[in-house]
Amino acid sequence: MDIPQADLDLLNEKDKNELRGFISNETQRQRVQGQTHALTDSCWKKCVTSPIKTNQLDKTEAVCMADCVERFLDVNLTIMAHVQKITRGGSK
């Protein structure tokens, strides 16, 4: 989102901070949405290997999708915990 500097200069500090917060929130929302789409695509390609015949996944596909999502979330939580530990000064 590019806003001309001349337009930004017209805003007071409160409005500038509010705009920065809005842009930050929208950027974060887009990242989460992008990760969700990537996860869905990855797990779908891994788990749904046969033609779709009904409006529901079969039991094997449903279990595979659930496991795939859980694994993704577990890995992300582990990585986030490790990064937080590193930023706090710990190396293990």
From Swiss-Prot:
Gene3D superfamilies, per the entry: Mitochondrial import inner membrane translocase subunit tim13 like domains
A GO cellular-component term linked to this record: mitochondrial inner membrane
Domain remarks: The twin CX3C motif contains 4 conserved Cys residues that form 2 disulfide bonds in the mitochondrial intermembrane space. However, during the transit of tim8 from cytoplasm into mitochondrion, the Cys residues probably coordinate zinc, thereby preventing folding and allowing its transfer across mitochondrial outer membrane.
Protein's GO biological process: protein transport
Keywords noted in UniProt: Chaperone, Disulfide bond, Membrane, Metal-binding, Mitochondrion, Mitochondrion inner membrane, Protein transport, Translocation, Transport, Zinc
Biological role stated in the UniProt entry: Mitochondrial intermembrane chaperone that participates in the import and insertion of some multi-pass transmembrane proteins into the mitochondrial inner membrane. Also required for the transfer of beta-barrel precursors from the TOM complex to the sorting and assembly machinery (SAM complex) of the outer membrane. Acts as a chaperone-like protein that protects the hydrophobic precursors from aggregation and guide them through the mitochondrial intermembrane space.
Chief location: mitochondrion
Species in which this protein is naturally found: Neurospora crassa (strain ATCC 24698 / 74-OR23-1A / CBS 708.71 / DSM 1257 / FGSC 987)
Similarity comment: family membership: Belongs to the small Tim family.
Motif segment (Twin CX3C motif): 43-68
Keyword Disulfide bond applies: yes
Subcellular location: Mitochondrion inner membrane
Disulfide bond residue pairs: C43-C68, C47-C64
SUPFAM superfamilies with a match to the protein in the record: Tim10-like
Listed InterPro entries: Tim10-like (IPR004217), Tim10-like_dom_sf (IPR035427)
Protein known as: Mitochondrial import inner membrane translocase subunit tim8
Membrane topology: Peripheral membrane protein
Membrane-spanning intervals of the chain: none
Molecular function terms from GO: metal ion binding
Oligomeric and partner information: Heterohexamer; composed of 3 copies of tim8 and 3 copies of tim13, named soluble 70 kDa complex. Associates with the TIM22 complex, whose core is composed of tim22 and tim54. Interacts with the transmembrane regions of multi-pass transmembrane proteins in transit.
